[in-house]
Structures are given as structure tokens and as C-alpha cells.
A protein has these predicted regions:
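Hydrophobic helical membrane-anchoring modules
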Residues: 133-172
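Glycine-rich, basic loop-to-helix element that forms the pyrophosphate-binding segment
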Residues: 12, 22-38
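A short, conserved alpha-helix in the catalytic core of glycosyltransferases
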Residues: 113-117, 123-141, 145
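Conserved donor NDP-sugar-binding/catalytic core segment of glycosyltransferases
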Residues: 54-83
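Short aromatic/hydrophobic "clamp" motif used to bind/position activated sugar donors
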Residues: 43
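Conserved nucleotide-sugar donor-binding
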Residues: 39-40, 104-118
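Short beta-strand/loop segment that forms part of the nucleotide-sugar
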Residues: 1-4, 21-23
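A conserved acidic beta->alpha catalytic loop
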Residues: 2-10, 50-51
């Protein structure tokens, strides 16, 4: 779902054969609009700056056999920097031990489980942590990696961006 982008996103996606859903700004609302428009038994929710790696779908079907589990990916950033590896490792540890994956780790969830937790929240930010909170005990990490663009971290700095993320979580 597009939340009012001003670049060529919609044009490029349309030319590639994608169906574009227009929604309001804010990830939660965009995700909700996409889910409503799509329908289906399972949803794979990804941020626009995330990339599935080659071979991701090999054997993927076995994870669709249990509607009571929502899955997220191991995170890796698109940067060779040491801080990219440190930040990605921390995100994976945080997700595993605290059950708090962020949206940049993706989410594979059955429609049945999504409905059982009253759907996705339309909040603009922290929709990922809100969903993780409601899915407590029903989340598991896939043995697959999702590549997320490191541009935001590299622009602001790994420590500053990380500190801002922690501050947002604390305020939430």
C-alpha cells in the first residue's frame, strides 16, 4: 500500500504489473489497507526497503502448516559495516528473547491468527511492536534472512539511529 509517496514508486510498481493500493500516511494504515485489499489465508508483510533473498521460498510451505504461529525473518542490513552486523545481531537477539521483532524483519501471519488478535493496528508508528505484543507467545523466527536497506542508519549514523529507535520504544 502506498501512503502518498511523492517519488516514482507507484509508477514503477504499476509498470511492473503490481496492483497499487492507496492509503493514508503511516505504516499501520497502509498495512491495513493492503490486507483488506488482498484477502487470502496467509499474509507476508514487508517494508518497502526490505528484500527477500534468492531461494527464500524453497521449502517455505512447511511454515504455512500451523495457523497459530506468526513468523518473522532474521534481519541483515545491506551494509558491510561492522555496526550493521552488530545492529542486525542485536535485532535478532531482541526478537528471539523478548518476542519483539520490528517490522523490518517482516511478518508471515495467517488470516486466522491475525483475526484472533483483532487485526493490524492503524497506528502510524510502532504498529510492529503493537502486533508483537498482541502475538506474545505465538511468534517464531524463520531460518531465513531478510535484507533491509541500511541507508537510514548510514545517513544518521548507526549509534544515533539505534538510540532514536530505543527512545521511540521507551516512549511507546
Amino acid at each position: 500500500s502506498d501512503g502518498g509517496s511523492y517519488d516514482q514508486t507507484c509508477k514503477i510498481a504499476s509498470e511492473a504489473g503490481c496492483h497499487i493500493v492507496q492509503g493514508k500516511c503511516g505504516r499501520g494504515g497502509q498495512i491495513c489497507e493492503g490486507l483488506i485489499e488482498t484477502g487470502g489465508d496467509w499474509f507476508l508483510i514487508l517494508h518497502a526497503d526490505s528484500e527477500l533473498l534468492h531461494g527464500w521460498s524453497d521449502g517455505f510451505g512447511k511454515y504455512l502448516s500451523d495457523n497459530s504461529i506468526a513468523w518473522y525473518f532474521r534481519l541483515r542490513f545491506s551494509s558491510p559495516a561492522l555496526m550493521a552486523r552488530v545492529t542486525g545481531t542485536w535485532a535478532n537477539v531482541r526478537s528471539s528473547y523478548f518476542g519483539a521483532p520490528y517490522g523490518d524483519q517482516g511478518l508471515l501471519i495467517s488470516n486466522e491468527l491475525l483475526n484472533s488478535v483483532n487485526g493490524y493496528s492503524r497506528i502510524a508508528l510502532m504498529e510492529d511492536l503493537e502486533m508483537a505484543r498482541r502475538l506474545k507467545g505465538s511468534l517464531a523466527m524463520l531460518p531465513l534472512t531478510l535484507l533491509t536497506d541500511a541507508q537510514r542508519y548510514e545517513k544518521k549514523g548507526w549509534v544515533i539511529q539505534g538510540a532514536q529507535n530505543i527512545w521511540r520504544v521507551v516512549r511507546y
